[in-house]
């Protein structure tokens, strides 16, 4: 019986390593791996210790030649930055893998494990794993260096208003906070007649100027100063200054218009009250309820000033009122206000209660005033006015008294005010003793003007209890629907204490 033989199996023979003599599978180098590594180091030329620069102030890393980037520890961006440090040396090998080895955050060391391949003797491919140690060295970036040297700003916006109070700047502060335009501001400096906003770039300063032009009537002038010049790269370093001037007219100011401007506004009376200042000046004629708006360009063509300072307002008591109904509108007259009621009133100064002197006038506050109420206004009959337009008017067309607004108990209004406003961090040149009273005047303006509140974020004040409506005396108040919750970082959305923040 014959047995068939199976196919012969071929097996690869071993060879002896030319260095140590141990049997190994054949390879182009005729060496074992251990001897090959002792003879050839494919990581030769790749530095095993490299330095990276880190700015402690802004927590950014330097990416040569002059770029600073934000990278988290063991992030992909930081790994890319570390590999770029070895880019020239890694060009001769093939990078297979790279990753971080964990180190203590305070050790100032970054360790990266690299896996590389390279063709060595006679076409043999050798793979090697090694660690590169990165030493984190502290270096201040140019931006932080300018901050520490107090020479960090590239543009400044100087906002000025030629008035004796700061209510306009309190309003601007709230609108800036609402639109978050203060985030790019390096520094805000408060001086006696305005605010200075400092920026790191000219574009941020231009953005602030555009915002101011949309918020209040103003005009500006731009200038720049050459700081340095590089003759090799033809690079210029400028500092830009934007000087913004706001119109010197505010809410509750009594003004006298020029005859040409009054005629262009619908044959309006020259003596008017500034009811509100937004992007335009809102005027109302207290004797006819005619209203008009004056924008910034029109104001600078036909400028007018306030006849009185707010401190010159006097307190009157209403003796009698009579509503004027069905008043005919003259031909060519402008629009009339639907929120006010025209009335004739007899008033007497509270400082002259022991006399019989009374004043008769027309007012736009007919919907608010009743006999016995207190009202604030200006006495034109017993004052010396120095204004070019009012001096040319017929004295018979000048009223004796102009009433501005109803007076309420200020202490009571402050006590029941259950809301508050945010404030910007700013450097104060000097605190005026009258600043607190001016700030209270601004808060009262917010309570009295609903349209003004639309541009302001109002927050609930949990420390002040809400009074019942039975204590209401008629003073305007802000409803709870208009207030926002004052949510802090340490609270969650339900108002409870949230998780604590991790700090170093």
UniProtKB/Swiss-Prot annotation:
One of its GO terms (biological process) is ribosomal large subunit export from nucleus. Acts as an adapter for the XPO1/CRM1-mediated export of the 60S ribosomal subunit. The keyword Protein transport applies. InterPro entries: Nmd3, Nmd3_N, NMD3_OB, NMD_SH3. It is found in: Cytoplasm; Nucleus. It comes from the Eukaryota. PANTHER family: 60S RIBOSOMAL EXPORT PROTEIN NMD3 (PTHR12746:SF2), NONSENSE-MEDIATED MRNA DECAY PROTEIN 3 (PTHR12746). Belongs to the NMD3 family. The keyword Transport applies. It comes from Xenopus laevis. Associates with pre-60S ribosomal particles. Keywords: Cytoplasm, Nucleus, Protein transport, Transport. GO terms for molecular function: ribosomal large subunit binding. The gene is nmd3. GO terms for cellular component: cytoplasm; nucleus. This is 60S ribosomal export protein NMD3. The lineage of its organism: Eukaryota, Metazoa, Chordata, Craniata, Vertebrata. Its main location: cytoplasm.
């Amino acid at each position: 019986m014959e047995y068939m033989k199976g196919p012969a199996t071929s097996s690869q023979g071993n060879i002896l390593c030319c260095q140590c003599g141990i049997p190994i599978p054949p390879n182009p180098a005729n060496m074992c791996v251990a001897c090959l590594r002792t003879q050839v180091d494919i990581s030769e030329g790749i530095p095993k210790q490299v330095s990276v620069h880190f700015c402690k102030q802004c927590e950014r890393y330097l990416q040569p030649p002059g770029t600073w980037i934000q990278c988290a520890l063991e992030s992909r961006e930081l790994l890319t930055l570390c590999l770029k440090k070895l880019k020239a040396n890694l060009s001769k090998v093939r990078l297979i893998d790279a990753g971080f080895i964990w180190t203590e955050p305070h050790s100032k060391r970054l360790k990266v494990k690299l896996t590389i391949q390279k063709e060595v003797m006679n076409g043999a491919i050798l793979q090697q794993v090694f660690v590169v140690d990165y030493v984190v060295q502290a270096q201040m970036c140019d931006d932080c260096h300018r901050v520490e040297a107090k020479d960090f700003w590239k543009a400044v916006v100087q906002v000025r208003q030629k008035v004796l109070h700061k209510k306009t700047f309190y309003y601007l502060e709230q609108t800036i906070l609402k639109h978050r335009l203060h985030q790019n501001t390096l520094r805000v400096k408060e001086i006696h007649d305005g605010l200075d906003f400092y920026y790191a770039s000219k574009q941020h300063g231009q953005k602030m100027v555009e915002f101011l032009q949309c918020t209040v009537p103003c005009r500006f002038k731009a200038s720049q100063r050459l700081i340095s010049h590089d003759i090799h790269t033809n690079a210029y370093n400028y500092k830009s200054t934007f000087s913004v001037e706001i119109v010197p007219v505010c809410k509750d100011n009594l003004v006298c218009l020029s005859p040409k401007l009054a005629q262009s506004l619908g044959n309006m009376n020259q003596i008017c009250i500034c009811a509100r200042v937004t992007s335009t000046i809102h005027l109302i004629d207290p004797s006819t309820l005619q209203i008009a708006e004056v924008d910034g360009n029109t104001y600078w063509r036909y400028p007018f000033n306030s006849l009185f300072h707010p401190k010159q307002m006097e307190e009157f008591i209403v003796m009698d009122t009579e509503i004027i109904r069905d008043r005919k509108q003259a031909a060519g007259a402008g629009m009339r206000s639907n929120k006010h009621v025209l009335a004739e009133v007899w008033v007497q100064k509270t400082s002259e209660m022991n006399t019989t002197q009374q004043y008769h006038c027309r007012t736009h506050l007919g919907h608010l005033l009743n006999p016995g109420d207190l009202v604030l206004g200006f006495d034109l009959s017993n004052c010396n006015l120095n204004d070019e337009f009012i001096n040319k008017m017929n004295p018979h067309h000048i009223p004796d008294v102009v009433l501005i607004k109803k007076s309420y108990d200020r202490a009571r209004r402050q006590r029941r005010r259950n809301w508050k406003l945010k404030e910007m961090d700013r450097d104060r040149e000097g605190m005026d003793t009258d600043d607190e009273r001016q700030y209270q005047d601004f808060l009262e303006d917010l309570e009295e003007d609903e349209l003004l509140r639309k541009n302001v974020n109002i927050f609930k004040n949990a420390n002040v209890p809400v009074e019942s409506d039975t204590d209401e005396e008629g003073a305007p108040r802000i409803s709870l629907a208009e207030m926002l919750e004052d949510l802090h970082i340490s609270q969650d959305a339900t108002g409870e204490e949230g998780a604590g923040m991790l700090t170093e």
